[in-house]
Amino acid sequence: VLSSDDKCNVKAVWSKVAGHLEEYGAEALERMFCAYPQTKIYFPHFDLSHGSAQIRAHGKKVFAALHEAVNHIDDLPGALCRLSELHAHSLRVDPVNFKFLAQCVLVVVAIHHPGSLTPEVHASLDKFLCAVSSVLTSKYR
């Protein structure tokens, strides 16, 4: 459960991310594909080369969804219901992949905003990403 401090921390750091959804999203996906190559199986039709238009577009979608989640931080299930159903029923993404992506999101935020990612903010953002992952996997049950 996210505390009020966690929510404030997430909103504060995300305000710095919000202007870079495509760039950071693409970077997070590229990191995930490199660090966890098994995740590539969900994207057989993508050009997975650095900076590809498909990675940039999908990265923007991923970070736009996270942006929406931040904007609805008090109702993550409502904000992410459609995506949860899509990933569980249509795409059948293995739930562990959400944790892989969350790790890469944290790394990207740390690289671009090192001064903002204090230990407390890091913990809050990690809790938020875990909550998002939990909601996205809720339809698997």
Swiss-Prot record:
Keywords: Heme, Iron, Metal-binding, Oxygen transport, Transport. Heme b binds at H87. GO terms for biological process: hydrogen peroxide catabolic process. InterPro entries: Globin, Globin-like_sf, Globin/Proto, Hemoglobin_a-typ, Hemoglobin_oxygen_transport, Hemoglobin_pi. Coiled coil: none annotated. GO terms for molecular function: haptoglobin binding; heme binding; iron ion binding; organic acid binding; oxygen binding; oxygen carrier activity; peroxidase activity. Pfam families: Globin. Red blood cells. O2 binds at H58. Signal peptide: none annotated. The keyword Iron applies. GO terms for cellular component: blood microparticle; haptoglobin-hemoglobin complex; hemoglobin complex. SUPFAM superfamilies: Globin-like. The keyword Heme applies. Residues 1-141 form the Globin domain. Belongs to the globin family. Involved in oxygen transport from the lung to the various peripheral tissues. PANTHER family: HEMOGLOBIN FAMILY MEMBER (PTHR11442), HEMOGLOBIN SUBUNIT ALPHA (PTHR11442:SF48). This is Hemoglobin subunit alpha. It comes from Crocodylus niloticus (Nile crocodile).
